[in-house]
Every structure is written in C-alpha cells, then in structure tokens.
Amino acid sequence: MDGIKYAVFTDKGIRLLGNNQYTSNVESGSTRTEIKHWVELFFGVKVIAMNSHRLPGKGRRMGPIMGHTMHYRRMIITLQPGYSIPPLRKKRT
C-alpha cells in the first residue's frame, strides 16, 4: 500500500461510514486510478466512486523563521453495496 497513508476518522468521516464511504489520507502524488487499484487489490472490494481534495499544510514557526508542513490529499472512497472495509485496528481490552 504505497499510496494510502492512514484512515481518517473525523465527524464527517464517521458520518460517511453509514453511506458505505471511507475516508483516508493518501500521498499527494498518487492518482485516483492508482488508489482505486490499491484499495480493490488490498481489501478485495469494488470501488464505484472516488472523490478527492487537497488540504493545505499548516504554518510552523521555528524561532524567527516561519516554515510550513507539506500539503496532503484526502480521498473519499465509495464502495458498492454489500462490500465493506474491515476495521484497521482492534480495540484493546
């Protein structure tokens, strides 16, 4: 899984789980077709739609110098009905 960094569980991301949509951050150089191929190959699901947007980096101050973090890309992946992605981590007991 070279392009997918991690799953995102924000308020909107949790709400979209009910619509069989999964949110994850991916590398900014990855294309939609690459991400679709990786998701279908790794999880064994069928992807019907993909939406993406680029999020800006945040400003970071290091003494008198103002720097910034890198921007990143977020993908919203819609799966066919009947398919789902299992949780990435189990809850500790």
UniProtKB/Swiss-Prot annotation:
SUPFAM superfamilies: Ribosomal proteins S24e, L23 and L15e. Keywords: Chloroplast, Plastid, Ribonucleoprotein, Ribosomal protein, RNA-binding, rRNA-binding. InterPro entries: Nucleotide-bd_a/b_plait_sf, Ribosomal_uL23-like, Ribosomal_uL23/eL15/eS24_sf, Ribosomal_uL23_CS. The keyword rRNA-binding applies. One of its GO terms (cellular component) is chloroplast. GO terms for biological process: translation. It is found in: Plastid, Chloroplast. Its main location: plastid. The keyword Cell membrane does not apply. Coiled coil: none annotated. PROSITE patterns: RIBOSOMAL_L23. It comes from the Eukaryota. One of its GO terms (molecular function) is rRNA binding. HAMAP family: Ribosomal_uL23_B. Belongs to the universal ribosomal protein uL23 family. Part of the 50S ribosomal subunit. PANTHER family: 60S RIBOSOMAL PROTEIN L23A. Binds to 23S rRNA. This is Large ribosomal subunit protein uL23cz/uL23cy. The gene is rpl23-A.
